[in-house]
Regions:
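Residue-level signal for the "D+5" position in two-component response regulator receiver
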Residues: 27
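Metallocofactor- and cofactor-centric catalytic cores in central/energy metabolism, strongly enriched
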Residues: 48-49
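A generic "binding-loop/recognition-motif" signal
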Residues: 55
Length: 280
């Protein structure tokens, strides 16, 4: 699990605030692997974890061993989810992502989506959970299939922010599925969603354009300490670029003496000694 630890540290260093843990792969024991990864990641980084599984037994075991307050991804109005996942969330004091789906599948329109959000919210309150336990998924679809997908998601985000006073989350990559140069679409979607009140996004923090846009958007909206965070990020990126350029132009002993045979080994040594590189 060395790779898992390395990825977790890299994600945190690049700005992730929560790490989503999903072990839903063919050919593995999901419950056992989920336990191992939670142990490794929670002891490696400071970020809280989001437990991402559709299996009830895996979710309960993950919450049982996690040394903190986790975020469940996700609970919907689907019968099995709301009847079994909500009690587990309450039992272990977890927060949860409210996914506006029902047994009928995707909501037909914005009004049905609001109805699902309200119904799941009310059920959670009846069970004794708190308002602060819930994060609503904007449920964004791909614009390749629905040209109004982005607008519908923005309306859900605004409704949760202005009417329900609930934080929101969405998966960025969904919006651009099947399109060329997806990063530009994802970045534009993110900045507009932040303006509507989006709280969190499921994304890869190593994507520099995306993260820079998020930090800049927060600053333009005058969110607390956003100016300091933006400046600190830009300074860190500038330092990394300067260090990278220093490594690239530095001559190795073999290059200085014309000994081409050993220059490959010298280059790998230089990369190994540099903090932002990993030799493969």
């Amino acid at each position: 699990l060395d790779l898992v630890r390395e990825m977790a540290m890299a994600q945190e260093e690049n700005g992730a605030r929560i790490l989503d843990i999903n072990m839903g792969m063919n050919g593995i024991d999901e419950k056992e692997m989920m336990k191992q990864v939670i142990y490794e990641v929670s002891s490696t980084v400071d970020c809280p974890l989001c437990i991402d599984t559709s299996h009830i037994d895996v979710m309960e075991e993950a919450l049982r061993i996690y040394p903190g307050r986790a975020l469940i991804n996700s609970i919907s109005l689907e019968s099995e989810k709301i009847e079994k996942m909500l009690p587990i969330a309450k039992k272990y004091g977890a927060m949860f992502v409210l996914l506006p789906l029902s047994d009928e599948g995707l909501p037909k329109d914005g009004e049905e989506k609001k109805h699902i959000i309200e119904t799941v919210y009310d059920r959670a309150m009846e069970m004794g959970m708190a308002h602060e336990d819930i994060v609503v998924d904007g449920l964004v679809a791909t614009i390749g299939a629905n040209p109004e997908a982005a607008r519908e998601c923005y309306e859900t985000i605004a409704y949760c922010k202005d009417v329900r006073k609930l934080p929101t989350i969405c998966g960025l990559s969904n919006i651009s599925f099947g399109l060329p140069e997806r990063m530009y679409v994802n970045t534009a979607f993110l900045t507009m969603a932040i303006c509507e009140g989006l709280t969190m996004a499921i994304a890869n923090p190593s994507q520099e354009l995306l993260m820079n846009a998020a930090f800049a958007s927060d600053m333009l909206l005058h969110r607390p300490d956003s100016d300091i965070r933006y400046i600190e990020r830009m300074n860190r990126l500038a330092e990394q670029k300067a260090e990278y350029e220093t490594v690239v132009v530095k001559k190795t002993p073999a290059e200085s003496t014309g000994q081409k045979e050993s220059s490959g080994a010298d280059a790998i040594d230089a990369i190994k000694d540099h903090p932002i590189f990993t030799a493969v």
